[in-house]
UniProtKB/Swiss-Prot annotation:
Disruption phenotype: Mutants born at the expected frequency. At 8 dpc, they have a reduced beat frequency of nodal cilia. The motility of tracheal cilia in adult mice is also affected. 25% of tracheal cilia axonemes have missing dynein arms. Double Pierce1 and Pierce2 mutants show high levels of embryonic and pre-weaning lethality. The few mice that survive birth display hydrocephalus and laterality abnormalities, dying by 20 days of age. Microtubule inner protein component of sperm flagellar doublet microtubules. Interacts with CFAP53, ODAD1 and ODAD3; the interactions link the outer dynein arms docking complex (ODA-DC) to the internal microtubule inner proteins (MIP) in cilium axoneme. It is found in: Cytoplasm, Cytoskeleton, Cilium axoneme; Cytoplasm, Cytoskeleton, Flagellum axoneme. This is Piercer of microtubule wall 2 protein. Residues 113-122 have a biased composition (Polar residues). One of its GO terms (cellular component) is sperm flagellum.
Length: 122
């Protein structure tokens, strides 16, 4: 059998003392903020259900179809309608959009082509 020396005992005690001195690693989310969107809650427990509804994920309470389920109520309507002047639109209606009918024969200049490192590579 191998005989333990003082050096071996010192190594063993230092290893155990280091393990005892180390604090436990903190949880990943120490400050959860919103517990629904943090990692403090187990995703399997995020379901909610009442006697009138089926179980549903808390993170996704509404679907796209639920946003348009109710028609707008009168208290959401604006009180006054103030149309803006349509001068720009009227000008476009009479003159049309700008058309550039010139012929583009010049080389395209980009930063890559104009860079001194790439000037003689083409």
């Amino acid at each position: 059998m191998a005989r333990e020396t003082d050096c071996d005992l010192d190594k063993k005690t230092s290893l155990t003392s280091d393990a005892e001195m180390r604090p436990e690693p903190p949880a990943l989310c120490v400050n959860p903020g919103n517990p629904v969107f943090s990692c403090m809650l187990d995703p399997k427990t995020l379901h909610t259900a009442t006697s009138l509804s089926k179980a549903q994920m808390i993170m996704y309470k509404t679907s796209a179809s639920q946003y348009g389920a109710f028609s707008p109520r009168p208290f959401f309507f604006p009180c006054k309608f103030l149309p803006q002047e349509q001068a720009f639109t009227e000008h476009l209606k009479t003159t049309g959009f700008y058309q550039n009918n010139s012929l583009n024969v010049g080389p395209d200049r980009t930063r890559t082509i104009d860079s001194p490192n790439y000037q003689h590579t083409l």
